[in-house]
Each structure stands twice: as C-alpha cells, then as structure tokens.
C-alpha cells in the first residue's frame, strides 16, 4: 500500500528540488522514467521509508526489471493498467489480471510496452528490455509445460 501511494511522489518534482539534493540519476534512463528513481530516493531520504520491497516497487514501477517481487509487479501492473489509461488492448491486458499469473501479465504488458516504445512513441530504457527478456523466458518455459 505504501509503495502504491508513493510511486509517483517525485513525478512533478524537478531534479533541482531541495528534497533531491543528494540524488544522482542513473545513466541511460530516459527522462519520462526518471521519477521512479527519484521517487525511491524521496521515499527513503525524505519520508524515511526503509523497507527494500517498498523502495524497489517505487524504483521500478515504470520500467520493470528482471525477477521482480510481488509488490513490484502489483505496482507496475496497477500503474500501467489503471482506470485512466486508454490505449489499444488495455481492456485485454486488464482481463489478464483476472485470468493469468502476475508473471504472465508482466510478460504481456512489457511486450505491449516495448512495441509502443519501438514504434517511436517513447524513449526505450534498457531495464524495460531486460525485464521483457526475463518474463519472455518465463512465458516460454510455462508454455512448454
């Protein structure tokens, strides 16, 4: 719950804000996803959050990453599929939550996200590619069972 409430806390906060004085943005991260990292920094250094699971759920809620924990997956999927989103196949992806495992939903959502980004509609983050490759392997392994 804490991660869900705080995941976008730094979304509109400039990197020059006093609350982010010690924050160093990671390399190779497009501007639209920087807030996930600055948000985790803000949660830890301003609000005193120490729970690694909460911090990771904030830190990777936009890009994903390989081998995410349950809280990370839930925040990622909730953020991507929230009621205010309106993009092709969003209803189908939401239905996945009721019908499939979190890992399968991660695979499908990351696949959609990569297609969108590769079509030139946004900057691609290496973490998203790594996350997709990880969940694609799980998807393939589950299909062979």
Cite the ranges covered by each PLM segment.
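Generic detection of intrinsically disordered/low-complexity segments and helix-coil linkers/edges
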Residues: 1, 110, 126-129
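Divalent metal-dependent catalytic cores for phosphoryl transfer on phosphate-bearing substrates
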Residues: 1-107
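Long, amphipathic alpha-helical surface segments
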Residues: 102-120
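Charged phosphate-binding loop/patch that engages nucleotide di/tri-phosphates or the phosphate backbone
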Residues: 115-145
């Amino acid at each position: 719950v804490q991660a869900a409430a705080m995941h976008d806390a730094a979304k509109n906060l400039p990197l020059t804000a006093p609350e982010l004085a010690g924050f160093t943005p990671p390399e190779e991260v497009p501007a639209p996803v920087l807030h996930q990292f600055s948000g985790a920094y803000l949660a830890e250094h301003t609000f005193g959050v120490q729970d690694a699971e909460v911090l990771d759920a904030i830190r990777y809620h936009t890009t994903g990453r390989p081998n995410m924990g349950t809280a990370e997956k839930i925040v990622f999927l909730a953020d991507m599929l929230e009621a205010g989103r309106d993009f092709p196949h969003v209803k189908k992806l939401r239905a996945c939550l009721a019908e499939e495992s979190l890992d399968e939903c991660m695979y499908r959502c990351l696949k959609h996200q990569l297609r969108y980004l590769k079509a030139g509609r946004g900057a691609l983050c290496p973490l998203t590619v790594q996350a997709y490759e990880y969940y694609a392997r799980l998807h393939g392994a589950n299909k062979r069972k």
